[in-house]
């Protein structure tokens, strides 16, 4: 009987141990206690059940805008642990078949882990998962002193479904948000900006020095003064107001005026005078009662009753379109010696108008 009882108790212990190990393995494979993975999927059913039991409350809208509280710099630089509360011990851990999970690290222990990471230079190097710089993106520190992007570690836990460090393969690590990479990136940016600014200031100062102080070398000094002379000449040329467009506009305006004057002249004097018009002009000249040539001041024709001698030749008389009468020979001489007039346009000696002439029969 005692043997049977002892044998049965051993079997019961083996069964309990097997069940405990299976339960631990199942819980470990389900992996419901990830550090940075999204917990929203595991809590959907709980939220739905709570929403059914929730009491609705009236919302009073006062019309006032809510004041947005800007996050302080201290809060943005604050470090905090991401791990949820540790799950209760499984049956295998309670029976001592599997060791319990490590306890939560204290602030001093986290400081030691952080110092170890700084000595390794993990924040200076790129993220081991995405191979990119940390810059200002969220950064997490593991309890094994390795550093990753928070989004990269979240994606790694999501697709591997294991809480294992991507580098050292440590299980059930703890995570803490740090800002060492962001701080180093800001220092790097400030250093680069200062370097660019100092370079700009020095280059500007040296360029001004080259433009104001002549060099001591003879060839360089010659080039320096040649450049200065060229700049001064260019400034003098630029100071002159040429106004080429205004000059061209004035030329076009003068040409248009000249064309209009010539067109009016051609309309007025370009056509030939008919016989009827010459008769009217001759009648008008007779009314003037002009008896002497205004050029030579000699009589246009012999006095009445006087005849021209055999050796003398009567002088021809020219009638102009302006109704003035002159000796034809005198008018020809005047046309020949006139400087400003060009044939066939000549000006009358009396009224200074252009004319056409007709020789009158004696």
From Swiss-Prot:
The residue ranges of the IQ domain are 186-215
* Keyword line: Cytoplasm, Metal-binding, Repeat, Zinc, Zinc-finger
Q: Which domain of life is it from?
A: Eukaryota
Q: Name one Pfam family in it.
A: IQ
InterPro entries the UniProt entry points to: IQ_motif_EF-hand-BS, RNF32, Znf-RING_euk, Znf_RING, Znf_RING/FYVE/PHD
Q: Where are the zinc fingers (RING-type)?
A: 127-169, 293-352
Where does it mainly reside? cytoplasm
Gene Ontology cellular component annotations, sorted alphabetically: cytoplasm
Subcellular location(s) of the protein: Cytoplasm
- Entry-linked Gene3D superfamilies: Zinc/RING finger domain, C3HC4 (zinc finger)
Drop me one GO molecular function for this one: zinc ion binding
**Which purpose does this protein serve, as stated in its record?**
May play a role in sperm formation.
Protein name, entry field = RING finger protein 32
